[in-house]
Amino acid sequence: MKKFKILLCLILVLTLVGCSSGGATSGGAVPPQKPEAGDADNNEYLELREQNFISTVADNIVNVSLDSSNAAYSNLRKLINNLQPIPTDAVNIEQMLNYFTYSYENDSEDQLKSYLEVARCPWNDENYLLSVAVKAKEFQLEENRPNNFVFLLDISGSMYAEDRLPLMIKAFKILVDNLKDNDRVSIVTYAGTESILLDGAYGSEKAKISAIISDLSAGGSTAGSKGIQRAYELAQKHYIEGGNNRVFLATDGDFNVGLSKIGDLKKFISEKRQTGVYLSLFGFGTGNLKADTMDTLAQAGNGNYYYIDSLLEAQKVFITELGGTLQTVAKDAKVQVEFNKEIVEKYRLIGYENKQLTDEEFDNSETDAGEIGAGHVTVCLIEITLKDLVDDAEIVRCTVRYKDALDNELNKEAITICNGITANPSSEFLFQSAVAEFGLILRNSKYKHNASLSKVVSRIVDNKLDSDDYRREFLQLVLKYMNDYVRR
């Protein structure tokens, strides 16, 4: 009955969309329109240059740095819900894919395990789609190492809005509620000057920590702050050998935290990660978000970048995925996909525009690649064209290489081989392809071919919708885009 009601709602919504004029009548791949509603968007994003098809004769190997960042999806969700224009570079397909949880398991002794699947490409039936999913080993919270956290919090005047400091306070109180008694917490704020509000309190002092966070108020400029230096000093002061030592930087995008040039800030953070102190970034608010800088700094600090647009998202980051958010299991994680040149004619990596590595970088154990948190699944999709299809022939070989974060062992690797095409792709493959297809439509990709919003919706409905709140929310987001953007 529940599924019947959902389908009925879909039919009604699609009927409304179908009755609209122009290119929206088919629910097809129309480019994003620009709604009049919403504030001016001064957000900044990394430039994402769409990748072209590459012949396997020229190069049959693609190397990618993996990580668990997924902030682009949260930001995209807020843009659509607020009826704001959608910049092309705001549509980061790999972060959209990596936002969701998947049912892959890792029962091996390795920290990372890969899954390969090849099936027909939904938006171009002349091609095929390869899914490379890398699953990190799960850890229970009680198995986690002790934590030493420094909260570096932006309380400048621009943080006054409800979706900035007030939401940040609620989010970090969620994190505090989940601390273990032997964890250590310090708090540094920055505005006109930096202030140390808490110096190495224990996780057992939750009431004290929460009270300090609750009392934060926004005001002043950010000139002259040395907040980032203070944060790392405290992290080093309370450093836990064998523990998880991390700075959490939360801001609406103002990075005047003591080092005026982003290059200097990146260098400083990179040097500090060598001491075992990592950095995670949390973006709040809209209109001033520097997603490009936050992505760059997170990578430099062996951490991830999250965008928190709601209390629900804060709960996802700090409760549902807490173990993965706090516990890195694989450092410098990278994947190499090698195609059989006798079978695969050409290929195109979808997303990961700024995460590709050379063969030399993949082989070099000193290459700075991504970090994967416990239980996380990182997904790469590659569209491929086949020459000939030979039964049970090797199509692709995948090598995952990383350093074990628990024992820092170098060059651990796992190899997976894919033989043949599946006629009945898994529900995970179907959902991943739906997310990617929506991304291609939003980007108005020249490779979207026959991508269709209607097909995206159908695939989601058939993909165990009732079992996952976040996938249900994604469906609602696609429908809202169809109704509020396409109909215009």
Language-model region placement:
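Positively charged n-region of N-terminal signal peptides that target proteins for export
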Residues: M1-I6
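Acidic/polar low-complexity segments with low predicted structural confidence
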Residues: L46-Y128
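C-terminal motif of bacterial Sec signal peptides marking the signal peptidase cleavage site
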Residues: T15-G18
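Short, low-complexity, disordered segments immediately C-terminal to signal peptides
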Residues: S20-G38
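Long, acidic serine/threonine- and proline-rich intrinsically disordered regions
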Residues: S55-A58, V62, N70-R77, K331, ...
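Acidic, Ser/Thr- and Gly-enriched intrinsically disordered low-complexity segments
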Residues: N81-N98, D107, T328, E338-N340, ...
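Exposed acidic/Ser/Thr-rich ligand/metal-binding surfaces
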Residues: S20, P31, L112-D332, K387-V390, ...
